[in-house]
A protein has these predicted regions:
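A generic structural motif
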Residues: 40-44, 175-178
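Structural motif
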Residues: 34, 54, 115-116
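Short coil/loop residues immediately preceding or within conserved phosphate-binding loops
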Residues: 35, 58, 148
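Conserved GNAT acetyl-CoA-binding A-motif
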Residues: 84-97
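Short amphipathic alpha-helix that is part of the acyltransferase structural core
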Residues: 1-30, 41, 46
Length: 351
């Protein structure tokens, strides 16, 4: 049979409702983060298969159990890959159930890491992650040989605050070399290029800190796919397990012995993440150092506090929370669209 595949618009509530039911029937749910969705229709215009994208990832792929074995998933994936290629995304990623990894391998996807009996993280570029590790290593080869104490931090910096600066300065003072990994995904209020420039300005005085892009290998909890997880805590645990496997391979490549993280007693996600790092990282010879956050007037400095202050137009408070370089940017015309977006948003804090 010849089935048709078409794009589903966000306004097509009937089709989206049918997709939701199909996903539920097959044991998954629609992910919170999608920017393209397609569906396959039978001769009576019933939706029998679906798939979606978010940035350069494939998500929410499923075929009705009544039509499995007909090669429909292959057609859905091919359609999504073509959509991604048209958008200039040649390096694609997906997270799939453990039992489905073999199928995606047959379509050219390579395993990066896996959580046994749960999730497999895959990419369509052969040895892509190994090439990323090689790129990291070549960038610091000369410096690393002279650095017996090597540490790392992973940050989003949305935007870069005095809290971030304090944590980086502490790591820089206590180690010979510090690798700072900045989340590359562009899904924050402050775009990737802006965050990178603010970080560079904020660490310019630290000669032993090397800034790296995370590429698509390290992503935030906010955009980790949740569609085949039973609840939010399961999503968090899966993200942590994948993320720490990625990080420990990076650490082994770069000789990283310590990872610095900021404490955040009011964040459920951060508490779970920090506990997992304290347990898992030492198994790989990496010390997890949790640092009490820098405070002002007894309150911890965080990027979410800065965003809230921007929303409230409290510039005096903002000036006390960020380095001068960040504040200067916020006062510039280039920041106007970002500030407007934050001020118009209902929610500017993280989970």
């Amino acid at each position: 049979m010849n089935y048709s595949i078409g794009k589903i618009l966000p306004t097509d509530t009937a089709s989206l409702s049918a997709i939701d039911q199909l996903l539920i029937d097959e044991g998954i749910r629609r992910d919170r983060h999608l920017d393209y969705t397609c569906a396959m229709f039978d001769d009576e215009m019933n939706i029998i298969a679906t798939g979606s994208c978010y940035n350069n990832t494939l998500r929410c792929l499923t075929v009705s159990h009544e039509h499995q074995g007909e090669g429909l998933m292959n057609q859905i994936v091919t359609h999504l890959i073509n959509v991604q290629m048209e958008q200039g995304n040649n390096h694609l990623f997906l997270y799939t159930k453990y039992c489905s990894a073999k199928f995606f391998s047959s379509l050219g996807f390579q395993e990066i890491v896996r959580i046994p009996n749960q999730i497999v993280f895959m990419e369509n570029k052969r040895n892509g992650f190994q090439h990323y590790l090689t790129k990291l290593q070549s960038a610091i080869k000369k410096t690393q040989s002279l650095s017996p104490k090597i540490a790392a931090l992973v940050m989003n910096c949305n935007p870069f605050t005095l809290g971030h600066q304090y944590l980086i300065e502490k790591a820089a003072a206590e180690n010979d070399l510090v690798h700072l990994f900045m989340l590359s995904e562009d899904c924050s209020f402050f775009p990737y290029e802006v965050r990178k420039k603010l970080i560079q300005a904020g660490i310019a005085h630290l000669s032993n800190v090397v800034l790296h892009d995370s590429d698509s290998y390290i992503i935030s909890q906010a955009t980790f796919p949740s569609y085949f997880q039973k609840d939010e805590d399961a999503v968090i645990q899966s993200h942590i397990a994948i993320d720490l496997q990625i990080f420990t391979r990076i650490a082994a490549t770069l000789g990283i012995q310590r990872r610095y993280v900021g404490d955040e007693p009011f964040s459920h996600v951060t508490q779970i993440y920090n506990q997992a790092m304290q347990q898992k990282l030492p198994e790989h010879g990496i010390e997890c150092i949790i640092v009490n956050r820098k405070t002002i007037d007894g309150r911890a400095i965080s990027a979410s506090n800065v965003r809230q202050a921007i929303q409230q137009k409290n510039w005096r408070l903002i000036k006390s929370l960020v380095p001068q370089s960040t504040f200067d940017f916020l006062m510039s015309d280039k920041a106007t669209p970002i500030i407007k977006k934050i001020q118009q948003s209902k929610e500017v804090t993280h989970y």
